[in-house]
Amino acid sequence: MHHRLTSLLLLWVCLGAGISGAMAQDAVRACGTVSLALPMADAVVALRTEQHVDLVLRAGGGTETGLDALGTHTVDLALCSRNLTPADRADYPQAQLKTAPVGLQLLSLAVSRDVWVGGLRALSAEQARGIYEGRINNWKEVGGPDLRIRLFMAERGRGQWEIFAQWLYGEIRKAPMWNGSKVKGIEEARNTLEFTPGSCALLPPAFTDYRNLFALSILDGAGRPVQPTVANAAQGKYPLSRPLLLVTDDNPAGPVKVVVDFMVSERGQELIKRYGYIGLEELQAAQARK
């Protein structure tokens, strides 16, 4: 229910229904990855009633769309789910792009109970690539039970798919189209896994309860299983993760700084963690243990 309400709120914000009359002079415009837009949509009411700042989230797009809008000064904040590259900065030489980390998105290859009970505990990149490309169709081919594999994947261009494609192919553009069963988001993926035999989908580890849903480890180059933990992601050992960043043109000031400060505050971080993301405190603690 929470995710359905948030989707409605996001639509409401994008249409500008929360702005009385014309857009307020100090409204902060933002767009980019949906992964970050969802928790920020939950912050709209608090920002307006307590900080007197209107946050307007523009519909559609992803990280690239957000950066393009920021670089052309049509938004004040780009919502990004990857680190900036030299090419990003070269594309907008007039912009002084500054980043503010707000969390980490950590995903796992989650499987249904029957796959886990059948003995599967980990997959290599080559095995996962074979499943994605349809060359591996039964779990017994990768050490699991004799069950048909049912892989559910987010649409191409969605955040979860991009993390998966980057891991398997190095560059997103090299990944083939996904023509199999699709899920629209984390909640749908979780429900589908729970009730579909032989199923696999991408889920935050926090959403796997080890009663009905189970997170697989990933085999590294030496064949060693690497668990989907914050510590392993922070140390660069676990590949299915990416940063969540707010990007501004120059150091944030005025209403933009209010929004950034809110998202890194305790209240903003609770919104980040509500969606299964890793908050800054936990991430920094893991990095300190390197």
Predicted segments — roles?
Residues 7-18:
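Bacterial N-terminal signal peptides
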Residues 1-5:
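Positively charged n-region of N-terminal signal peptides that target proteins for export
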Residues 24-76, 80-90, 97-290:
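Exported/periplasmic ABC-transporter solute-binding proteins
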